[in-house]
Amino acid sequence: MKRALFAAAFVAIAAVVIASASPTGEPAWFDMQGCAFCKNLVKDPELLKNMTWEHFDISNGALSITTVKPEFKKSYMEAQAAMMDIGKKLQSGELKAADVPMCGHCQAYGKLAQMGAKTEYIQGAAADIWLMTSDKPEVVKEIKAFAQRNRDELAKMEQAEKAGQAH
């Protein structure tokens, strides 16, 4: 399994090397320092090293599975709760998206939600599962592109870690 980031409710991500903005000006895909959602994942500096996050295409969208070592479950749940709280405040209008700093991943997640993608989050004892689905082919295509980008960015992070460039 790939080392990972998070399966957030809006969560749906890590490395400092990838956290800087790209030369094109688009935000980094994962930004553990600047993203209002993702920064919750590094409050416990050992959390990311002790969890996995995998993404899979399914017929009508994508599936993500997150596992966390038992001794880090509390930190993970605290991060999840903080991210969910931000998501709820955005949905209710208490916060405006323009006022909430977000990485590329979290921006894309929000865009998919605005396109009508349906999300389900299942919290289990052994793993958490996140589903993002749609009945609209154009939205399914975007969901799968999102999952592929996550796989690609996680692979880059894994390569950077192996090369000793991350963290």
PLM regions: where:
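A low-complexity, Ser/Thr/Gly/Pro-enriched, surface-exposed linker/loop concept
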Residues: 24-46, 72-114, 150-164
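Short, solvent-exposed interaction modules
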Residues: 100-134
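Positively charged n-region of N-terminal signal peptides that target proteins for export
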Residues: 1-4
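Terminal, regulation- and interaction-focused segments at domain boundaries
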Residues: 57-74, 127-131
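Bacterial Sec-dependent signal peptides at the C-terminal "C-region" and cleavage site
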Residues: 16-25
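Bacterial N-terminal signal peptides
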Residues: 8-16
